[in-house]
Regions:
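Structural recognition of alpha->loop->beta junctions
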Residues: 214-247
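Sec-dependent signal peptide cleavage junction
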Residues: 20-33
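A generic local structural motif
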Residues: 4-5, 43-44, 73-75, 225-229
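Bacterial N-terminal signal peptides that target proteins for export
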Residues: 2-13
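Hydrophobic alpha-helical transmembrane signal-anchor segments
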Residues: 14-19
Length: 248
């Protein structure tokens, strides 16, 4: 599959996942909020779903390359065994350049892996034979698991977790990034031809700690809402917001 074709398919898939993931929460909140006026337009109403495949994908994942608990190879094998069709590994500040020779930044890995008993562990990758087997699905009825290239979670040392996931372009490796700075990685990824999403904004805004859903519409959050809206409008390659990560 050509790179541009796959990017278009993934763009469509990402947008669909985020839209349908948001609907239950929006309706649940709207049911108890009488003073909020909004309309939801389904951009996929005319899609003939009978002619499109349905794929099980995971696009935001970590390993011991950054702050994950499991080895790089184990993460891949686990998703494959669970029947996934598409996988991206997006370790903090470290571009996924290969599933056979994992890329890692030792100083960054040590800093982010402080929770682990052994903060630095050299990640292990797949053998070339196993990589070929997984991506072709030769031991799974021909249903291979597609690797999304160059996955990374940008701004690894941001003090308020202003993180941005990106794919398809080799950007951000070893770059510490800035606190509250979503725009720099989004802009640079777009310039290189990649795709991105804004991650778990509730960690940045503090809204994840609100127990009352109605307070999500408090004017105190207008600044953040406008900030994200501007980024999404200005950079078409930023496809949306990963709102469900870590309980947001």
């Amino acid at each position: 599959m050509k790179k541009n074709s796959f990017k278009r398919i993934l763009s469509f898939f990402l947008a669909a996942v985020m839209l349908f993931g948001m609907l239950p929460a929006v309706f649940a909140q709207g049911a108890g909020t009488n003073d909020v006026d909004y309309a939801i337009t389904n951009p996929y109403a005319t899609v003939d779903w009978k002619n499109y495949g349905q794929y099980k994908a995971s696009l935001h994942n970590h390993s011991i390359v950054s702050d994950g608990d499991n080895d790089f190879r184990y993460v891949i094998e686990t998703y494959y065994s669970m029947g996934y069709d598409i996988l991206a590994i997006t370790d903090h500040g470290t571009v996924d350049r290969s599933w056979t020779e994992p890329n890692y930044v030792p100083a960054l890995q040590l800093a982010l892996g402080f929770r682990r008993e052994n903060g630095f562990e050299k990640p292990t990758g797949l053998t070339q034979g196993r990589y070929n087997q997984i991506t072709s699905g030769s031991d799974r009825g021909g249903r291979g698991m597609l690797r999304v290239p160059y996955g990374i979670e940008n701004n690894p040392t941001s003090f308020n977790n202003s993180h941005v996931n990106s794919w398809f372009v080799d950007y951000g490796n070893g770059v510490l990034g800035g606190t509250s700075d979503y725009e720099t990685p989004i802009k640079n990824v777009e310039a290189l031809g990649g795709l991105s999403v804004i991650n778990h904004p509730g960690e940045y805004t503090g809204a994840r700690n609100e127990k009352d859903f109605d307070k999500a519409y408090n004017e105190d959050y207008d600044y953040y809402i406008n900030k994200f809206a501007r980024l999404l409008k200005m950079y078409p390659s930023c496809l949306g917001i990963d709102v469900n990560s870590k309980g947001d």
